[in-house]
Amino acid sequence: MIIGKVIGSIISTRKQENLVGNKFLIVEPLEAMAGVGRIVAIDNIGAGIGETVLVVQGSAARIGCGMPEAPIDAAIVGIVDD
């Protein structure tokens, strides 16, 4: 699990059918996660720019989104209260 800050969003006019209607955000891992680059993560919980979030990757991301067959590598699964 990665803790990071949402720094932007991705707009995609065309995407795989099972991803239509989903929002993608750019997450910058916090300093404690040194060595991990920016992540594009699917957001099903309504996170916004500037919020600190929890991100999972791999099969945990697909399961966490309820889309086990979707081509998802990272998903936002929580918003951290400051």
Which residues fall in each region the model found?
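N-terminal first-folded block
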Residues: 1-32, 36
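A structural micro-motif recognizing beta-strand termini
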Residues: 29-30, 42-44, 58, 80
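Short alpha-helix capping/helix-loop boundary micro-motifs
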Residues: 37-41
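C-terminal structural segments of small proteins and small subunits
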Residues: 52-82
